C-alpha cells in the first residue's frame, strides 16, 4: 500500500481554489485500485457589484493577492508541515480566462521550484469529470459539463473524453450571468444561484427561442431575446397573454428553456453510446432544477443522474489536485518550459491513460 499527495491550484475564472488530496494505492494494476482522501479544499471568490461582470485583469489581481494565503491555509488544514513531501503540484493549464490562469500558473511554478516538486498541467474539464466520478461513484456516464465558460456533452472512449455536442457560441453559465446583469441580480454567492432562487417563484412561462442543431446548441439568440424582455419589464411594459410578467417569471422561463435544450442533447448522447448514467459537472451543475429535469429524462430511460454539491461542482482546487495526481501516477509531468496556460485547451486533447 502506497500513498501519494498532490496540491492543486485552480484559477481559470473568478474562483481561486487550492486543495490537497491523498491517493492510497492498494492495487497499482487496477483502474480503481486506490482510495482518495480530501485533506483540504479552500476557495475564495472574486465578487463584483450587481449589474457588473468580472474583468480578467481585476480577477487576476484578486488571485495574486490571495493565492499565498490560500495555499498556506490548504497546507495547514491538510496538516502538511513539509511541502517537499508532496508528489506533485497540479495547476489548471486551461481553458479559462488568460490573466487569471497566468496568475495561478506563476504561483504553481514558484512553489514547485521552492519545494523541488514536479508540475502537472491539468485540463479544467477533465478535473471536473474525474472529481465527479470519484465523488458520485458513476462508472462510465455521459457527462454534461455546464459552467460559465463551457457547455459540452461528453462520453469516454479509448482513453479520451470525446465531445459529442457543445455550444456553438456562449456557454450556459455565461448566458445566465449576462441575463443577471441586465436585471442587476446580485453576484453573491453567484448570479446563477440567485436566478435559480427567483425561478422557483416564477409562475408564468414566457416562450423563448429554442435552438438545438443536431448535437449542438446555441444560446446567444435566447439571451438577446430575454434581455429585450427584461428591458421591457424594467420599463413596466411586459404583458404576455394578459399576465404582467415578473422578474421571477423571466428567470423561470430562461431556466426551463436552456435546461430543456441541455436535456435533449444529453439524451441523444445516452442513446448513441447506450449509457444509463448521466454525470452533471461544472458550476451550473449545482442547479437543482437542472438535476430534476435530467432525472426525469434518465428515469424514463431506466437510468440515473449523478451530481455533486457546491464543494465540488463549483471550480475548486481539489479537482485539479486529483486529476493531476492521476496523470502523475502514470508518469506524466509538465516541464517548466511547457507550463504556458492556454484559453483553448480542448477536453479531447488529453490522453486519459489512467483509464482502460
UniProtKB/Swiss-Prot annotation:
The keyword Acyltransferase applies. It is found in: Cytoplasm; Nucleus. Substrate binds at residues 145-149, 177, 192, 196, 287. Its EC number is 2.3.1.234. Binds 1 divalent metal cation per subunit. Its main location: cytoplasm. Keywords: Activator, Acyltransferase, Cytoplasm, Metal-binding, Nucleus, Transcription, Transcription regulation, Transferase, tRNA processing. The keyword Transcription regulation applies. Signal peptide: none annotated. One of its GO terms (molecular function) is metal ion binding. Component of the EKC/KEOPS complex that is required for the formation of a threonylcarbamoyl group on adenosine at position 37 (t(6)A37) in tRNAs that read codons beginning with adenine. The complex is probably involved in the transfer of the threonylcarbamoyl moiety of threonylcarbamoyl-AMP (TC-AMP) to the N6 group of A37. KAE1 likely plays a direct catalytic role in this reaction, but requires other protein(s) of the complex to fulfill this activity. The EKC/KEOPS complex also promotes both telomere uncapping and telomere elongation. HAMAP family: Kae1 (MF_01446). This is tRNA N6-adenosine threonylcarbamoyltransferase. It comes from Yarrowia lipolytica (strain CLIB 122 / E 150). The gene is KAE1.
